[in-house]
Amino acid sequence: MSHSTVAQIKLKSGGMSYAIRLSEGRFILIDGGTSFEADGAYLYEYLCSRTEGEGVVIAAWLFTHGHLDHVALAARFMTVYRESIRIERSLYNIPVGIDFCGYDAKVGNDRDAIFEREWFEAVRLYPEADLHEVRTGEVFRIGDIVIEVLLSAEDRYPDPPTNRNETSAVFKLTFENGVRFMVLGDAMGARLAKLVDPASSLFCHEGRLQCEILQVAHHGLAVASYEYFGAIETLYRRISPRICFWPTYAHRFYNDPWCQDEKYIYNRFLLCSVRERNFHSSQTVEINTEDRTVTLLE
């Protein structure tokens, strides 16, 4: 296998998980999901099946933010498979010691803090790995892929975040053949709007945003208030994806108002205008970046 692939990994327990195989055989992983018990073995088996017997080498593991549905599986995975995998780098920006004053505090999301701590302990099991806190504007080249950081946690300063979604990083990955993959994580309305606001220091011109593959923001619920609906639709129009990854269950994708209700005009735009296909995360979807073929795996 001499070409790169990008896959949305099936999750039984919810969350978000992506695996990118570089043309030379190493991997870039993004987040991971909620439950190791349900999904960790599947991820390991998938990676092994794509190594051609060379062993699993993770060139970089990217993390968007610290909610448990993005870091819990990774924390256990790194612990259980310590002797079976090699991790060369972790790219993240997960603030610690923040008193979240909004949703996270209201619902008592102590579990998120627990799994954040487990994650920090797990990454330190790999002393040979480079642990790097990303900042907006940084660019990394890993194998044949360029990773740009478009948003990071500090961009909210001086306003305190009210929940972990407001610290989510946004990454753009560009493959050697020009295919681009936009990873919005759980970034929501006000932060995503800055990417299309000419008055913002975070503004990205239209050509910089265009990507063939899009990870739909926050599992299909990109904003918390109507005032940003227009900005999110503008963002999605400028990204202009051919393929959308929706990190959400099939049932939610087909039935939940988050994805289908007409009030979420930005989701309607994606469902009606995406030139190829929309994919939920109840099955693994793998894209060959050379010929753009799509493979569905159980």
Where are these regions (language model features)?
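Charged helix-capping and loop-helix junction motifs
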Residues: 166, 197-199, 227-234, 261
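Active-site environment of divalent metal-dependent phosphoester hydrolases
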Residues: 14, 36-37, 66-72, 96-100, ...
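Binuclear metal-ion centers of metallo-dependent hydrolases, dominated by the metallo-beta-lactamase
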Residues: 84-91, 95-148, 159-165, 240-298
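Stable alpha-helical elements in mature extracytoplasmic
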Residues: 39-43, 73, 111, 115-119, ...
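Active-site metal-binding motif and surrounding structural segment of the metallo-beta-lactamase
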Residues: 37-92, 201-222, 237-244
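Core dinuclear metal-dependent hydrolase active-site scaffold
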Residues: 1-56, 127-213, 285-298
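Short regulatory "switch" loops immediately downstream of catalytic or recognition motifs
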Residues: 77-79, 94-101, 154-156, 196-200, ...
